[in-house]
Amino acid sequence: MSMPKEPRQLMINLMYLVLTAMLALNVSSEILNAFKTINQSITSSNNSIVDKNNKLYQGFDEQENMDGQRDRVKPYNDKAKQVKAEAEAVIKYLEDWKEKVIAGSGGRLENREIKNESDIDASTRLLVEKKGGEELKGKLLAFRNMLLNTVKPEVKGQFEKDLPVKIIEPEKSDNNPQADWSVAYFHNMPTMAVVTLLSKFQNDVRNSEAIVVQQLANEAGDIQVKFDAFQAIAVPKTSYALAGQKVEAQIMLAAYNKAVNPSVTSSGG
């Protein structure tokens, strides 16, 4: 499991790892409730990432529609749209698996809560015995490879290290002598824990989508902007002046594009 740099994401990952380790000792209602809390946090995080990504996609469309920019921006925008489509497909695929496991464990109550959160048969049957986990693993790998093939070759090596969506093969153990990935993640795992893991995979997909689309946006940022307006600007050398006092100022002519409304931030004190 990859570890993100953001504090909130790091905390979610660490909590998931701790809870998974505790499952090996005891499947208690307290641990299952903790998984439920982590799942809610991951879902909230996923929604925030979607909002961020949508702003990037909107920015691509706006930039492509600017005068004289279409031919230069469109290749980046097309790549971004492909990333979005592939990400949405994987997100839906993982969501479908959640519902399959929940249905296999007994379904939901009227309030939409999972009926049998501690059931360990559904995940084992569907994702291990019926090889659903192998298919899921293949989907994640295919998405990862698509993202790596989207970025420029000179940054691909760094992205191979940084992309959150990745497959980490387990080591051999007494319970998993073949080091089978599906067994490591899904064998005898409670339904609530599996649902949380699938949400974690969705989080990895969303974060990886954001990283690659941001890279495309950075590359598109090198595009030349056509200036269509000019304005005289006076920049005084002092922030205040007394009545009758002479003021020195730097006079310049600024060129800009009326269609561009940049956002400027500062990290200074």
Report each predicted region and the residues it spans.
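Juxtamembrane extramembrane loops of integral membrane proteins
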Residues: 35-202, 209-212
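Conserved mid-sequence domains
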Residues: 161-269
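C-terminal, active-site-flanking charged/polar segments
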Residues: 19, 23-26, 44-48
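Membrane-interface motif at the C-terminal end of an N-terminal transmembrane signal
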Residues: 23-37
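Residue-level marker of positions within ordered structural domains that often coincide
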Residues: 29-30, 95, 210, 256
